[in-house]
């Protein structure tokens, strides 16, 4: 959470129109497909606050186009783009989550679960079909080796 917070704060300080945040365990097997999807979304003029390039999405969600869905519940912060107009909202959400995570030690305050409330009220889009996923690795949150590939490449669960 803290590294994501720092990225957002830096983007705000630098007046960047967008920031794209990637975690270090990302796998992008089809980079040209992702680039084309993102370009089509940016050119479409659709309103969005956060564009998730990857995620572990759960139903219900709304299929908007062949390139993206609107999500209400999507785990992981593997890769995403945030518009400058949304920096303050996400910064506040992450700060609150960090404080409550430290105080309670409850994993429901981790960045990728704490922002569910934002997903329900604002516009979080996820690339569809998903092609990006996290490499198999040890999860500090789960305390074990995890492999999310199949979960992240499916939106119908």
Residue spans for each PLM region:
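An acidic/histidine-cluster motif and surrounding catalytic segment
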Residues: 1-22, 26-157
């Amino acid at each position: 959470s803290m590294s994501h917070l720092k990225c957002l704060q830096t983007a705000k300080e630098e007046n960047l129109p967008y920031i794209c945040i990637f975690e270090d365990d990302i796998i992008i097997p089809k980079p040209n497909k992702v680039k084309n999807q993102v370009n089509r979304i940016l050119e479409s003029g659709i309103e969005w606050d956060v564009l998730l390039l990857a995620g572990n999405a759960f139903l219900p969600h709304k299929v908007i186009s062949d390139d993206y869905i609107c999500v209400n519940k999507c785990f992981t912060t593997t890769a995403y783009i945030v518009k400058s107009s949304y920096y303050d909202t996400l910064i506040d959400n992450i700060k609150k989550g960090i404080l409550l995570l430290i105080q309670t030690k409850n994993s429901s305050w981790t960045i990728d679960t704490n922002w569910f409330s934002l997903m329900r009220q604002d516009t979080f889009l996820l690339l569809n079909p998903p092609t990006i996923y996290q490499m198999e690795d040890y999860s500090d949150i789960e305390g074990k080796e995890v492999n999310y590939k199949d979960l992240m490449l499916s939106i119908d669960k």
